[in-house]
Amino acid sequence: MAKKQSILSPIIRITFTFLVLCGLVYPLIVTGIAQAVMKDNADGSLIYNDKNEVIGSKLIGQNFTDPRYFHGRVSSIEYKAEASGSNNYAPSNPDLEKRVEKSIEEWKKQNPSVPVTEVPIDLVTNSGSGLDPDISPKAASVQVERISKITNIPKETLNQLIKDQTEGAALGLFGENRVNVLKLNLELQKLMK
């Protein structure tokens, strides 16, 4: 019995020590460093309005349906962050074809002056997560005519807005040029006032 206690005692102490180190000390240190070095990222890259209220995140897409605003990618999960994911249909899957056709029909209704052949793929397909906050600059540009017509903001102004909001590839190497739809729409909203 004494031998069992002599073996269990160090096991319990080591377990408790690592529980405290890995469960409390390490997370607190990492959180402290993150808050000190990159507070914006550590807090979720939140975007605030003029009243200092959180209206979204740079990292999570939102569903914009008002024709006065730029629209983002299609989301099969309706931008619900807790259900991140996509159906990941194969290109030959009939369900994918139906969903893309539905997206194209919606596009035609909202943008009758833009031929379907000019619609970038990112406006009719969803991303792997279903939460993508960005679209390509071309996807933003093909929406300019609709927005200009509704808001009476000149096309040149809208194109410049897209150019100003375009972010390059990470480190100039990874990914594509992209436009964050929420940030773009916030700047557009300022022009509408």
From Swiss-Prot:
Its main location: membrane. Signal peptide: none annotated. Keywords: ATP-binding, Cell membrane, Ion transport, Membrane, Nucleotide-binding, Potassium, Potassium transport, Transmembrane, Transmembrane helix, Transport. InterPro entries: KdpC. The chain crosses the membrane at residues 14-34. It is a single-pass membrane protein. One of its GO terms (cellular component) is plasma membrane. It is found in: Cell membrane. GO terms for molecular function: ATP binding; P-type potassium transmembrane transporter activity. Part of the high-affinity ATP-driven potassium transport (or Kdp) system, which catalyzes the hydrolysis of ATP coupled with the electrogenic transport of potassium into the cytoplasm. This subunit acts as a catalytic chaperone that increases the ATP-binding affinity of the ATP-hydrolyzing subunit KdpB by the formation of a transient KdpB/KdpC/ATP ternary complex. The system is composed of three essential subunits: KdpA, KdpB and KdpC. Belongs to the KdpC family. This is Potassium-transporting ATPase KdpC subunit. It comes from Bacillus cereus (strain AH187). The lineage of its organism: Bacteria, Bacillati, Bacillota, Bacilli, Bacillales. The gene is kdpC.
